[in-house]
């Protein structure tokens, strides 16, 4: 059954993944806004050297994977549920326990509640990231959404920034400037800063070397 519908499963996951990940970012930002303190979090590719990026931080002894695992489980259950609505029963080993005797019952009473519970748990993990971001310093995640550190104080060495970004940062505080400087030095990285007034900005270092910044409207 898995081999017959694997491509359908994968395609559903690919289509839903950008929606889910943007939702994760949205929830984290909104939770930071709700605290009225401001905060920052960043995503750094695991392959990127970051030893000189921080002057202080609280590293975990190993990456915390709760958020990453919650994302993967939600992606899996969404694919299973979408296929089930079309009358296809399948699941990767370990996601759901048993084959269904009553297919409609299985869809309504087992798959859908598990998907709902997975989304609730994912929201709680987003809230946890937001809570850590409310501390001074940034939360550091890798691009697989593994949590590496929090309360990270970014080095404030000032690189040569594009004129439009430099002009934008002229009216911003240390949190924005430090994040922009850090992201500009790390190819493929993303940083999000939420101000105390609730406004949010995303900085992104493109693979070509350019850095873009976007006001987030949620």
What are these regions (language model features)?
Residues 1-218:
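Divalent-cation
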């Amino acid at each position: 059954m898995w081999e017959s519908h694997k491509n359908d499963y994968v395609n559903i996951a690919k289509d839903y993944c950008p929606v889910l990940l943007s939702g994760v970012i949205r929830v984290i930002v909104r939770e930071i806004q709700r605290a009225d303190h401001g905060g920052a979090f960043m995503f750094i590719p695991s392959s990127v050297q970051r030893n000189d990026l921080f002057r202080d931080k609280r590293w975990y002894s190993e990456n915390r994977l709760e958020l990453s695992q919650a994302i993967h489980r939600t992606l899996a259950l969404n694919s299973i549920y979408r296929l089930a609505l079309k009358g296809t029963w399948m699941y990767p080993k370990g996601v759901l326990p048993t084959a269904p005797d009553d297919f409609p019952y299985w869809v309504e009473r087992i798959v859908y509640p598990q998907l709902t519970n997975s989304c609730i748990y994912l929201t709680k993990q987003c809230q946890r990231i937001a809570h850590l971001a409310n501390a001074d310093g940034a939360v550091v995640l890798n691009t697989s959404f593994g949590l590496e550190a929090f309360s990270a104080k970014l080095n404030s060495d000032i690189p040569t920034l594009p004129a439009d970004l430099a002009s934008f940062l002229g009216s911003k505080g240390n949190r924005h400037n430090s994040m922009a400087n850090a992201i500009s030095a790390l190819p493929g990285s993303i940083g999000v800063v939420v101000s105390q007034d609730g406004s949010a900005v995303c900085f992104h270092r493109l693979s070509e070397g350019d850095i873009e910044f976007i006001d987030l409207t949620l």
